[in-house]
Amino acid sequence: MGAESVWASGLLVLWLLLLVSGDQDTQDTTTTEKGLHMLKSGSGPIQAALAELVALPCFFTLQPRQSPLGDIPRIKWTKVQTASGQRQDLPILVAKDNVVRVAKGWQGRVSLPAYPRHRANATLLLGPLRASDSGLYRCQVVKGIEDEQDLVTLEVTGVVFHYRAARDRYALTFAEAQEACHLSSATIAAPRHLQAAFEDGFDNCDAGWLSDRTVRYPITQSRPGCYGDRSSLPGVRSYGRRDPQELYDVYCFARELGGEVFYVGPARRLTLAGARALCQRQGAALASVGQLHLAWHEGLDQCDPGWLADGSVRYPIQTPRRRCGGSAPGVRTVYRFANRTGFPAPGARFDAYCFRAHHHTPQRGDSEIPSSGDEGEIVSAEGPPAPELKPRLGEQEVITPDFQEPLVSSGEDEPLDLTRTQASQETLASTPGGPTLASWLLTGVTSSTGVPSPSSLGVDMEETTPSGTQVAPTPTMRRGRFKGLNGRHFQQQGPEDQLLEAAEASAQPPTLEVTADHMGPSAATEALESDQSHSPWAILTNEVDVPGAGSLGSRSLPESRKWSPSLISPSTVPSTDSTPGLKPGADEAPGVKSAIHHPPWLPSEPAVPSSIPSEALSAVSLQASPGDGSPDFPIVAMLRAPKLWLLPHSTLVPNVSPIPLSPASPLPSSVPEEQAVRPVSFGAEDPETPFQTTMAAPGEASHGSPEADSIEIEGISSMQATKHPISGPWASLDSSNVTVNPVPSDAGILGTESGVLDLPGSPTSDGQATVDMVLATWLPLPGHGLDTGSQSTPMEAHGVTMSVEPTVALEGGATKDPMEATMDVVPSTVDATSGSEPKSSISSTHVVVTAAGDQGTPTLTPTSSEGQVVAQESLGTLTSLPSHPWSSLASSMDEVASVSSGEPTRLWDIPSTLIPVSLGLDESDLKVVAESPGLEGFWEEVASGQEDPTDPCENNPCLHGGTCRTNGTMYGCSCDQGYAGENCEIDIDDCLCSPCENGGTCIDEVNGFICLCLPSYGGNLCEKDTEGCDRGWHKFQGHCYRYFAHRRAWEDAERDCRRRAGHLTSVHSPEEHKFINSFGHENSWIGLNDRTVERDFQWTDNTGLQYENWREKQPDNFFAGGEDCVVMVAHENGRWNDVPCNYNLPYVCKKGTVLCGPPPAVENASLVGVRKVKYNVHATVRYQCDEGFSQHHVATIRCRSNGKWDRPQIVCTKPRRSHRMRRHHHHPHRHHKPRKEHRKHKRHPAEDWEKDEGDFC
């Protein structure tokens, strides 16, 4: 293609020359009237392909009459461009009297080939063409006062694009690369095409095949892992000619469109097959990748991903805007995976780009005008596998969004984030007559920095329907129109009363964000009936525009949210992650955004569970709060089930009757913020005594723990409390200010005992301490009675261990042990009945929840620390009560019931100690301390300033000269350098941190270290560079290096290095190897060779072979004695390979640093300043003549790169006597020439065309 285009351009120029000669012989009579006449071209725009040559014609005629010498025609070529709404002429070249001057930026690309022989032919030869060369060109000819000009339009066709196979990166052989370009309506690009695209700013860090079987890629801005052809400089990097079977990507070149590409955006997006069919119905076909790039090149701008013929999804961007293609124009690709590989699945739904041949090419502005502003981007996240569920009573059918696969868009500043989440599935057995359980929609926490574990977003539990019961779905559909990115609306179906929001993924520590939206009983769990095993979930994060949707119609989703629901089927107790009617409190930590979904459906009547195992104790949440940085207190962890808070005053507990929820009585969509708790009744075993569950809002989360809010809390939801901050310093707390109250109830509930100290205003507090002990109570089995008034058996011990090990044994299955937590706590009082006051404590409680009996009723088995069973009452309830003064919990409900209050039998009187807590969580190695109420006295003593009268520094416990410093009863040692430890008893090695710079050797001594510096370095740490390198050379560890990009054979390269007082580089350490390899990114010669003795490799600078870095199975002497020289292979991190010495490659020279000795002495002169022994390269010294002598010539000399000084030019002489100077001053015999003859030549006035020479070289 290149040779043909050059010949065509040459023939065009020849034809133009013949044309002008004929025109000059047959001039019109009107032409003779003017001295200058421009032969204007009447044809249309000139089209030429990228990287080719083009001739822009410019002819004029001259009247053959005599004219002054100054009337020589002046020719000027300019490019007309528009800037700020005004036309500007960009100079290209000027020519006059066979002198041509080319403007900067056009040198080497433009010429006037016919002008030297035919001064009336100013045809401009331009090339190799770039895409930016398209535009309007002006040829202007000026002769005297006559001025003629002509305009020529140039259109550069063709575009270079990178193509990656669908299956993976670097997956194409050379033959496959050619075929891929052919299927994309293009050809494989030539090196000149890629070079032209690079010169226009094309940057792509993917190696791809070119037509000459080389592999290259263009880099306009070097960055780690993506370098140009030279170190940290832009260029097209080449791997050279490669084996055709090697695998790379490919660069394609599309030349002409030959039709039109148009965008198809139906109301409902299409699968790949649907997109093909839709284009065929419109008399077109899916556009190819090359056709879309050509359409983009011609002005197509559409911020909507669409299917193409090869199964990829792309969209063209002309005007970059926020969340629409990144910061630069181009064709963006939507990849399936986050590493920019894979095409979307054929079943995914997008719009389409169709191509219709032999139609008018769309002009700029024909496409749909994109809307401006902060518009959304298309985000897709793959959700959990969707089990085949049938809609339950009161449920609605929810249609999944159109996107079916996770998608990541390439080339964007704000990438389409993707997080794949899978949820484990549990199948719960159900017997006839059991309750109909609703699926609870839980929002999980995802992080963009990684892929969460399969269970990180909850547990999928398959719903079951009682046998013989048929539940018909009652779908009530609505169609929501989501405003698109340039005016159109995406169509999405969903339930009327359900708006699903998402947890925002962030690269920062995960933040729990759950949406508190109204979900009435009619808005039940999604019923997904799909043939696929995986049903991804996605939303369109655009502005929500749903007409007629009530108050939710004008809501806008956050900018970049993703959601992936998890389904939970609770057995008898719902998860606290889905608490109705809660809003985050005003005093919650800013790092936690709390919101809860309403339960989608609740039974209208109490139902009796039957043989349903419950994973009640399934998760424990660990949160650590770093506090405010106070040094007085350690970081305290919170081991809790639900996050329950304490009240410092007495309040009331609401006694709410069961609330049957039905479609006629939906929950309110909003709850006042002061109503922190809303009780919800569920059906229990006894229809007459439904158990009551009250769920509390989550508490404040940790700001410093990466694990905060990353573990879901399930199955613990029968305590009721609200949190109130406790003001005042820690030392003023007493037991009356810390209160925990379980809710007394006749029904079986799952409870916790929680102790929280929340001290946000304390100047000495380092956070908050929470100690939660998980206990459980169950209703008696049928046929058994329980005396609720019976007295409990007192059990007490002090300073013992509380072990909470949730263990669930499923009927007929293996025991599951999801979490264990062990904690040492102070004694706790436990009442074995549900109505009496606390009177004693248990020493150690090992809680095991198992399925007991035929009916699978879970029982609680507390055991003592000695292993004996303390209490095992499957027919009773076990309620944990604190030993603090009683108080009640608060709720702003209308119906309230007073909880009896009283004083405990005894108060804690254990000595105040800090008891360590070991958290048995795999995700955390945090060791913290919990507090006992007895800490009050300890901190009061500290606050009062009491201390041991004995001075701890009296005997100076610090060793090795350390200084003892006291702080009350505590002391600390300030150690001298080289020592560490509590008493400065550890002699540390100062050289472990490598303090010596520039390759210096560190030697550890008794009280410090010393550095042995390499030559040319000095200072205590070898930080001073005492010797330098010549210009263009780089210094590293005492030597100077220089990379030469021009190619030579090995012997010629060594000879060139020796001319520069060096050798081909030698390598003696990994650090030096890394430094040398950073110069160029092509294979380069080094000084290693075995030319003298086979297999005996030596360096040319005669240094020893101390370090080797050969490629695998090298050296191999492949050419049987012809591989005697060594090259650094660039694409293998500079590993060595022996090759024939006649290869022409770049090379690196190495030489020592250079210094000059004392400057040479000059007669009758001395140096200015202090005389030194050594001088760096390029140093300059000045001489001054002694007193009584006059200076002649230059007084300075310079130290050259060869270590030698310039020859001094200064001459100091004594002045002659004045009378002798006067005697020889006048020479009467010498005849002076007339002044006229000494006059300089008259300077010619500057021509007007020379005024533009400031723009030219």
UniProtKB/Swiss-Prot annotation:
Domain Sushi intervals: 1154-1214
Keyword terms of this UniProt record: Calcium, Cell adhesion, Disulfide bond, EGF-like domain, Glycoprotein, Hyaluronic acid, Immunoglobulin domain, Lectin, Proteoglycan, Repeat, Secreted, Signal, Sushi
Carbohydrate attachment residues: 121, 339, 380, 410, 737, 944, 967, 1164
Segments for region (Disordered): 361-391, 447-493, 550-610, 683-707, 1215-1257
Disulphides: 58-139, 181-252, 205-226, 279-354, 303-324, 953-964, 958-973, 975-984, 991-1002, 996-1011, 1013-1022, 1029-1040, 1057-1149, 1125-1141, 1156-1199, 1185-1212
Domain C-type lectin: 1025-1154
Annotated GO biological process: cell adhesion; central nervous system development; modulation of chemical synaptic transmission; regulation of postsynapse organization; regulation of synapse structural plasticity; skeletal system development
Signal peptide (UniProt feature, chain positions): 1-22
Keyword field contains Secreted: yes
Tissue expression remark: Early postnatal and adult brain; not expressed in kidney, lung, liver and muscle.
Bias kind Basic residues: ranges: 1215-1244
InterPro entries for this protein: C-type_lectin-like, C-type_lectin-like/link_sf, C-type_lectin_CS, CTDL_fold, EGF-like_Ca-bd_dom, EGF-like_dom, EGF-type_Asp/Asn_hydroxyl_site, EGF_Ca-bd_CS
Main location: secreted
Reported modifications of this chain: Two isoforms were found that probably arise by proteolytic processing. The large isoform is predominant in early postnatal brain, the small isoform is found in adult brain. O-glycosylated; contains chondroitin sulfate.
Subcellular location(s) of the protein: Secreted
Location of the Ig-like V-type domain: 37-157
Residue intervals of the EGF-like domain: 949-985, 987-1023
Domain Link, residue spans: 159-254, 258-356
Listed Polar residues bias regions: 464-473
Known role: May modulate neuronal adhesion and neurite growth during development by binding to neural cell adhesion molecules (NG-CAM and N-CAM). Chondroitin sulfate proteoglycan; binds to hyaluronic acid.
Similarity comment: Belongs to the aggrecan/versican proteoglycan family.
Name of protein: Neurocan core protein
